[in-house]
Amino acid sequence: MASVKLASLMVLFATLGMFLTKNVGAASCNGVCSPFEMPPCGSSACRCIPVGLVVGYCRHPSGVFLRTNDEHPNLCESDADCRKKGSGNFCGHYPNPDIEYGWCFASKSEAEDFFSKITQKDLLKSVSTA
């Protein structure tokens, strides 16, 4: 009788262990993010969709960006996107290689100035917490 209970308990733990290990590798693409995080959202399986210049929300990359890019006035893939939307003349791409789009600025110098300030702040913040 004890061996039947022990066997049932072993099967229960084995089943539970299989489900837990399957979900360990799954990326959760929810929550707030920054396009400057590397990788964005804590996983390269997720994308950070900006709603502001330095803040966004995490999503799986399945076609979400194409819809968002067309709807958002400042998201761009090229300088032509910015001019077409009337949001600027220059598409400044994020310095994060996981982000394949940029933000519209009035000029290249404005984009360089903004990104240099942000990356310096992030660098100083990461050095001070280390």
Curated annotation (Swiss-Prot):
PTM field: The C-terminal glycine may be removed from PA1b.
SUPFAM superfamilies: omega toxin-like
Keyword annotations from UniProtKB, A to Z: Disulfide bond, Knottin, Seed storage protein, Signal, Storage protein, Toxin
Signal peptide: 1-26
Prosegment location in residue numbers: 64-69, 123-130
Record has Disulfide bond as a keyword: yes
Disulfide bond sites: 29-46, 33-48, 41-58
Matches recorded under Pfam families: Albumin_I, Albumin_I_a
InterPro entries for the chain: Albumin_I, Albumin_I_a
One term of GO molecular function: toxin activity
Superkingdom assignment: Eukaryota
Tissue: Major component of both the cotyledons and embryonic axes of mature seeds.
Described purpose of this protein according to its UniProt entry: PA1b binds to basic 7S globulin (BG) and stimulates its phosphorylation activity. Involved in the signal transduction system to regulate the growth and differentiation as a hormone peptide. Toxic to various insects through binding to a high affinity binding site in the insect gut.
Entry's free-text remark on domains: The presence of a 'disulfide through disulfide knot' structurally defines this protein as a knottin.
Protein name: Albumin-1 B
Annotated source species: Pisum sativum
Taxonomy of the source species: Eukaryota, Viridiplantae, Streptophyta, Embryophyta, Tracheophyta
